[in-house]
Amino acid sequence: MSCFYLDLLKIKDPSFMKQLDIQELEALAADIRAFLITSTSKSGGHIGPNLGVVELTIALHYSFNSPKDKFIWDVGHQSYVHKILTGRASQFGTLREHGGLDGFPKRKESIHDVFETGHSSTSLSAAAGMVIARDIKKEEFYVIPIIGDGALTGGMALEALNHIGDMGKDMIVILNDNDMSIAPNVGAIHNILGKLRTSDTFKQTKAKVDGTFFEELGFMYLGPINGHDIEEVITNLELAKRTKGPVLLHIVTKKGKGYQPAELDSRGTWHGTGPYKVETGSFIKPAKRAASWSSVISNELIRLAEKDERIVAITPAMPVGSKLEKFAKAFPERFFDVGIAEQHATTMAAGLATQGMKPFLTIYSTFLQRAYDQLVHDVCRQKLNVVIGIDRAGLVGADGETHQGIFDISFLNSIPNMTISMPKDEVEARQLMDTAFSYNDGPFAIRYPRGEAPGAQVAESNTLIPIGKWETIIQPIDAVILTFGPTIRLALKAAEQLELEGYHVGVINARYIKPLDEALLHQILKQKIPILTVEESLLKGGFGASVLEFIEASNYSDVVMHRIGLPDEFISHGSVSIILESFGISTTGIVLKIKEMLAQSGKLRAKRL
């Protein structure tokens, strides 16, 4: 079995591995590693994490019997090898495409994916539930959560460790320690692992590690173990299987193992990538026309911080993605990467605000969900001046259900004292940043999407934008489109097309999602023209819903209004443009809906020839 690569596409399940010897397992590892590099070079994906767990995943499937034994992949981005070994190699050509193979574990995709993940630090709690259910039902199987050292900094993981150790039930926890999560890890837990990792690494005896952090919590600790030595990993897994009570195997791996550009990565660049050239390690990207939204926000933050020493920046383990590295270098004493700890980050920002500081809390929209109670209880309830940069707001595409930034408007809309905004271009982003740090009446959220910000070549502008004041881009006559952020361009194109047919459709930049521009809304409603709201977010509890509530509360009748947005469902992975088109969030969708509304109001005319 020295040439195993060609057989990868024929794998149906992991049972064949039981017949392989160590050399054959190592050959399998080499073939899988080559397959991963080739396939992700075309599709993109989480190549670094998966190259680091090739041998570990092979050892797990060799020692256990999936799906009877339950693997729970924390975060789940490192599950590609697991997918290959469970019969999905042939689908890797569709990885993260619309309708294709998911980049994370998916229960409907395979019986071997027993729990879906995407956010970090959830695996241990899920595993606790499974072992409790197993024992109540008097069943026999192993539960094996695989969690990284980065995810172990999350409070939820520590809560679960505390409970699992106290319960004393049989469970085998795999700690995949690669000294990185997305960015280099931080914190005391990271330091503890570092001491274990460097103390006679791979030669520790049980006697030498008595009293470790994990044993104090009630776990039997095995390690550190070389995660790229299949035989050593299997030996320790077999020992863990014979041990009663919770066991933690400390597996040391190298992120990006086997592909030099990924191995040498210290910034997290190779954590998740787009397509790349295998030979050179260079990324294949379309020509960049403008700065990213994250860069625009970060650069403005630096400019403001140069003038105001009260401004500090906080990120929960995303300094690279949120483009805060320059800020960290310029103001190291005012930059805080707290690790995967969104709840702590949010209340820490609240504490800073009580002392007159001006915290900028930057969190991806999908991860802001994790800090909801802290937003309500600690920030908004106390009306504290915290500026929240909601990065990756809207659809993010390939990462799918677990990462779409589509819920924040709905869950922030209901919180008193919260201001929510979203710029249409770079200049407006800078203006909203300036406005936010000049605002002294509570929390101020600025949403911005993934990708490039239009308007990069426009001159600097420091004009503050009055709270709740919208911008009329095209004066409405026959109908009006209310929208914000990236969908502004769709509305403008739709208005241009409709103008050619003789319809004068207004476009309003509703850059403040909360509060609404009530004065402008009254003015529009008095015109008695059709109103269309467009948003790249959930309709339930969204911007359009707020407009409807305003209309009802203001006792307007006979209003022709429609909302375009995302339905009440989790949105799967795929191209953002394809997803938007499928829900009518497109120029064509807007044009058709406006015509439908004009017909409903009796204002549709025959198309000009």
Curated annotation (Swiss-Prot):
Gene3D superfamilies: 3.40.50.920, 3.40.50.970. It catalyses: D-glyceraldehyde 3-phosphate + pyruvate + H(+) = 1-deoxy-D-xylulose 5-phosphate + CO2. InterPro entries: Dxylulose-5-P_synthase, THDP-binding, Transketo_C/PFOR_II, Transketolase-like_Pyr-bd, Transketolase_BS, Transketolase_C, Transketolase_CS. One of its GO terms (biological process) is terpenoid biosynthetic process. The keyword Magnesium applies. Binds 1 Mg(2+) ion per subunit. Thiamine diphosphate binds at H77, G118, H119, S120, G150, A151, N178, Y259, E342. Mg(2+) binds at D149, N178. One of its GO terms (molecular function) is magnesium ion binding. Keywords: Isoprene biosynthesis, Magnesium, Metal-binding, Thiamine biosynthesis, Thiamine pyrophosphate, Transferase. One of its GO terms (cellular component) is cytosol. Pathway: Metabolic intermediate biosynthesis; 1-deoxy-D-xylulose 5-phosphate biosynthesis; 1-deoxy-D-xylulose 5-phosphate from D-glyceraldehyde 3-phosphate and pyruvate: step 1/1. CDD domains: TPP_DXS, TPP_PYR_DXS_TK_like. SUPFAM superfamilies: Thiamin diphosphate-binding fold (THDP-binding) (SSF52518), TK C-terminal domain-like (SSF52922). Its cofactor is Mg(2+); thiamine diphosphate. Its EC number is 2.2.1.7. It comes from the Bacteria. Catalyzes the acyloin condensation reaction between C atoms 2 and 3 of pyruvate and glyceraldehyde 3-phosphate to yield 1-deoxy-D-xylulose-5-phosphate (DXP). Homodimer. Belongs to the transketolase family. DXPS subfamily. This is 1-deoxy-D-xylulose-5-phosphate synthase. The lineage of its organism: Bacteria, Bacillati, Bacillota, Bacilli, Bacillales. The gene is dxs.
